[in-house]
Amino acid sequence: MKTYKVAVLAGDGIGPLVMKEALKILTFIAQKYNFSFEFNEAKIGGASIDAYGVALSDETLKLCEQSDAILFGSVGGPKWDNLPIDQRPERASLLPLRKHFNLFANLRPCKIYESLTHASPLKNEIIQKGVDILCVRELTGGIYFGKQDLGKESAYDTEIYTKKEIERIARIAFESARIRKKKVHLIDKANVLASSILWREVVANVAKDYQDINLEYMYVDNAAMQIVKNPSIFDVMLCSNLFGDILSDELAAINGSLGLLSSASLNDKGFGLYEPAGGSAPDIAHLNIANPIAQILSAALMLKYSFKEEQAAQDIENAISLALAQGKMTKDLNAKSYLNTDEMGDCILEILKENDNG
């Protein structure tokens, strides 16, 4: 029996609450598919600052190094806002983990469920065409990491990308498209940026190894418009760091709730950090009303990308779709009639059990 070692870093705010539901789902999935998990929990973020004086301890980092993947909750809160910026939970835990494990690829899915069209700001006639997008963003290069200078009369930032950096993120996008709808849009600004011209050259070359995938190009300004005007045309969106940062937040806005947004950050060895895209929401941390779906979907991404358990991941996604279709929702999705955090997790678990043919 295969055993997957997972570093469980629940963190602060709603993190521990929603993490509990994700682990509940994973435990059942492991039984169904005849593998096992070794969950090793550790403090991260503000909880780690309170316990050890630092947001990411050496012990926690070592635990992550000994694991096959990291399942991350959320960090931060007003309690630690008085600390210097570089010591606060968000800056001093997540960023060092990304750097240490060279997590260069960020994957952000955006799916609008038929039962949640009321939560999206988009018109029904747009949503009804189907919205299921994966934004693949390069995370460790580009303008955020280039040479910069802020002077009295002028300032500059430099965007530098190497062929190697572009090729490895492109392959992540094409491999992702193979288990989706087999289409990749490269989002760039090749009409004015030299770096975007290089992106086109490298991605076109990589595409030769993926003859089954349809590659299209789109300028970033047009892409920003099409996301709200005609999002059904997209499957996988491949973006540089800057463009991916902006467009993934736009995708979050059309989704309807941060409680539905999962993400994965991967390196070239298949190791990944999986986390909800929303924050720690300290204001509702003790109310048992947080939406656990983003955390559960992050666990499904872990199954899919780090452990290659695609069918197990699909089971979880299907169960969530069915629960929502049955009108089972948390307060962020339906303030008039809603389930608590643990009730939502139980509902998804029961659907998984009902559909268990094993």
UniProtKB/Swiss-Prot annotation:
Its EC number is 1.1.1.85. Its main location: cytoplasm. Mg(2+) binds at D221, D245, D249. One of its GO terms (cellular component) is cytosol. The record marks Y144, K189 as: Important for catalysis. NAD(+) binds at residues 77-90, 279-291. One of its GO terms (molecular function) is NAD binding. It is found in: Cytoplasm. NCBIfam families: leuB. Homodimer. PANTHER family: 3-ISOPROPYLMALATE DEHYDROGENASE. Belongs to the isocitrate and isopropylmalate dehydrogenases family. LeuB type 1 subfamily. This is 3-isopropylmalate dehydrogenase. It comes from Campylobacter jejuni subsp. jejuni serotype O:2 (strain ATCC 700819 / NCTC 11168). The lineage of its organism: Bacteria, Pseudomonadati, Campylobacterota, Epsilonproteobacteria, Campylobacterales.
